[in-house]
Structure formats: structure tokens, C-alpha cells
Regions:
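Catalytic phosphate/nucleotide-handling subdomain of diverse soluble enzymes
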Residues: 50-123
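Amphipathic alpha-helical interface segments
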Residues: 1-58, 63-71, 84-88
């Protein structure tokens, strides 16, 4: 829902209100409030809201991912969730980050990513 709303040009406030109302998540905490007591948890109820909070608090794509990862716990998943929302909201992955990632990936991964992006994202 967050990625869809971000792609529709909704504000962070609108995204927050929709998620709170629709899914019942408490998004009124800050990353600083979450960080001291947060630990790995396999439940989406303990990683998705925190990832969304990192997005809401983030100031750009990279800052959002850094905030999500800084929470600890299931950091790779949370970075992916927050980063996905940030990519949609901020209009893409910054060129410097994208270039660094692409040079580290096998060509077949890049082909699959480009096909997916062309088919589902650029529409």
C-alpha cells in the first residue's frame, strides 16, 4: 500500500494515516524511541511498522535505508521495505547508489531487474 500511495504522489502524512487506519499499525513512534529495545523478530507486525516509520522519518532515499538498518533486528528486510517505499516516494534510486549496486551484480540479475522495472514500474 505504501509503495502504491507513494507512486500516486501521496504525502507522507497521507501514507501514514492510510496505513494506521487500514492496518492498525502504531506509526507514532520515532526511530530513536524504537532503537533501544528493538530486537530481531520474525513477525511482520514487528518489522513492517518499524520500516514504515524509518521511511516516514527519512529525508531521502539513502537516509531512509540508513535509519531502517540502524534499528537493528531484521535489518536487511527492514532496509528493503523502507528502501522500496523511499524509491517510489523520492522518484528512484539515486544515480550514484544505482551505479555502485549495478557494478556488483551479475549481468543476468541486471537483465531480470530491468525486465521487471520495464514491465511493472515504468507503466
Amino acid at each position: 500500500a505504501c509503495v502504491f500511495l507513494a507512486r500516486q504522489g501521496k504525502s507522507k502524512t497521507e501514507i501514514k494515516e492510510y496505513v494506521e487506519t487500514t492496518f492498525g499499525y502504531n506509526l507514532n513512534r520515532t526511530c530513536d524511541e524504537i532503537r533501544p529495545d528493538y530486537h530481531f523478530h520474525v513477525s511482520c507486525q514487528r518489522s513492517v511498522p518499524e520500516s514504515i516509520i524509518a521511511f516516514l522519518e527519512g529525508t531521502d532515499y539513502e537516509n531512509t535505508i540508513r535509519l531502517a538498518v540502524s534499528l537493528g533486528g531484521d535489518a536487511d528486510t527492514m532496509g528493503a521495505i523502507a528502501g522500496g517505499i523511499a524509491e517510489a516516494y523520492y522518484g528512484g534510486v539515486p544515480d550514484d547508489i544505482q551505479a555502485e549496486v549495478l557494478k556488483r551484480l551479475p549481468e543476468n540479475f541486471i537483465d531480470v531487474m530491468q525486465s521487471f522495472y520495464d514491465r511493472f514500474v515504468l507503466k
